[in-house]
Amino acid sequence: MDVKSRASRSSRVKGLTEIVPTYWEDAVIPTRWKQGKSHMRDHAYIPLIAGLDIETSTAPDQSCAWMYLWCMAIDDFIVYGRTLRDLKCWINRLINVLDLRVDYKLLCYIHNAKYDLSFLRKTVSLSGRRAGEFIARTQRQIIKCCMDHCIEIRDSAVYSEMPLEMMGIDINMPKLSEDHDLIRTPETPLSDDDLRYCARDAHILTEYYHRQADIYGGIDALSDIPLTATARVRKRLDYCFRSQRGTMDYVALTKFIAYRQLHTKHTGKNAPTEEQLKKYERDRAVMAMLRSAFFGGYCFASPSHAGDVYKDICVSADIDAAYAWAMLTQRFPLDRFEPMPVPEDDAEELEMRNGLGKWYNHALLIHVRLHGLEARESELGFLPSWLRYSLRYDTLKRNKSGKRVQSAEMLELCLTDVDYRNLYTFYTVKEVEILDVVGSRYGYLPAYITDTIMMLYSEKAAEKTEIKRKRREHTATLQDEIRYQVKKTMLARLYGVFVQDPIRMHWEYNDETHHVESKGLEQADTAQYGHVLYQWGVWVAAWARDRLLGAIIDLGAPEDADGYPTWDGSVIYADTDCVRFLLHGEDDPRIEMLYAQNEETQIEMLEIVRTRKRQFEAIYGIPIPDDLLDKCGSWDIERYAVYKHIGIKQYCTVDYDGTFKATIAGLPKADYREDDNGETTNVGMSYFDQFETIEDKVEAMQVGMMIPEEESCILRSVYFDELHELDVVDCTGELRHVSTDCGLVLQPAPYKNRKSDVELLAGMLEEDVVGEITKLGIDFYKVAKAAGVHQGDVSDLSERIKEYSYDLELMEILKKH
């Protein structure tokens, strides 16, 4: 966007910040709206962007909620209504006046569509008539749909990954204030301030996405605006890929994509041959093995150290951009997986484990059955106990933390060659059966992956330099901080592109039942996700995990005479890219070891940049310094004045400047620090406000701690689908009648430190049920999440599992128990 258009938009926004919306019946739709179309494939959008926001009130007993106001902003034109019928009439009017059709839509954003659409779904149609017009992540989370087939709704939250307040600050349109505790109904008189509040929220959406449209080609290219935050990074990958047109990387991957697009339903000239069908079916089996072999970052919190306070001896070492480091420096399976020899004896098995002989220079997927599995150290398990990796097992026991496999009489699973080697590092096995092995040629990732990482790093570095300058000059604003965080998360989202699950649930909206219904699992057989293969994501996670496990051994598990780690108790916490350990003294040699590793990593990164720099600058026209990736993969070392953990992702720290920080998974972080005036301020949850001293705050972090609902910031979603009619006294003191038949109530819930929701779920089911679920290749975490399990809420669990289950076979299993 040029300077002139940016300035004109800023002045226009400044003049509209205090507007009062027009009642929908009095609104005159501008005739200029009907001019022009935006084309993309077979879709067309009117060159406008709309934003829709609703305001709701909750019944005193929290049994139901209702909408009392809606506002729709279309560019600088804002209207409002009071009822769902008003909204339906306004939508019909827009469709008729603008001549909206299935192929000529209005693009409309809703922030947190999961909430708003729960109130609208019985009033308007949400189904799509074409493929891709309805997209949902779960049965309740719709991220894209077509309202009455002509207004395309997109969830703003999954794109921006920011609260609406932050979006407003980013475009210099801060949200207004409103008392949400007051009860209002559609008949309650509203002040101009009430109307402005809702109008501002809708207006923020239109202005924010106008600026995003400018990034992706302007108002005439609305289809180019990505749907999600991950898709934004995918766009960057796609750009770098197409910039490599004509290179060997480009030709090789396009051929691979063309092969993956083969589908059994093709007929006539496009019908696949018998040999192609055999390869296709084999690839489907390999995809199942890949999904089974994938699991995320390694997490470890020593149970024997839980609740202990460590002063001035705890050091945290964090890997900067661990996943990007793996993509740049490690090798990956570059082509199709083919059958490989199965080891016939122990000597061949050892060769395969070390990547020698017949298996040299091949990335391997190994289907293995282990008998008599036992962890070498009770606290340091390696295999997670709740993932879909487990195909079959017998008498499986978990370690003290409940997160890792301690032992198993029999365990059948699929592993990458990287994880297979680590298996023997952390476990003893009485008998090993190798059932199947497939392999792919090892090699480094294509140049466009490196280019994407360097481009994202360059943008992040520019923002970082600017924010540091402003911080020194004390001119940094919250808007500057937000923009820096956006650039940081873009780099983190690159990993999300690599590990996007190729098999997902297909959801459709039923306009008769007003529910999202499962239509079974569907497999993405094309490499359409930003020209990244799923197998690369499996190995990215494996390499990052391998480095973390290696660091744990180096820092806290020295090898015994046989070369196996013996945990000395000094490593007390680890999570994905972070290791925390206790010092052995002021001159602990492990600190120097980490700095030495940093020097080696920096030399490696310097060579990567220098090798690619000339071509990168010639292709993209972006100058980059030699030390662009200087920090990538290096250890960021920090020593704490005080450290304490009570479980995985549950810990508190005190810095040497007196800053107290507390992290509890699922809750906003607490961050207590002194401002420029010497006063202590907090960003995050308020639970620790009641404790005056730092020592008291640290002491309050306890195993089994309970945080009241008014301080936990946890909101439990409770949906209702039945008709509620009630009389309530509104904020004006008048008795009003309210009728509502669908919606969502956000009920505050307390936090209790205890076993995870997944462990709760598994504890309520018999072991054979868990085994049957894992046989289906279904991620047990996703089952628990889909079941709607919340802290302190396991009522009617089995019924909710059936309602939100990901697979019809899963429903049948649960019905039997």
Predicted regions and their residues:
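N-terminal accessory regions of nucleic-acid-interacting proteins
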Residues: M1-A50, I54
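Short beta-strand/turn micro-motifs composed of small residues
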Residues: D53, I110-H111
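Ser/Thr-glycine-rich phosphate-binding loops at phosphate-binding pockets of nucleotides
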Residues: D53-D61
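Conserved acidic
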Residues: P60-I110, F119-I801, S805, K816-H817
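Conserved Walker A/P-loop ATP-binding site and its immediately adjacent core
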Residues: A113-Y115
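Hydrophobic micro-packing sites on short alpha-helices
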Residues: L810-L814
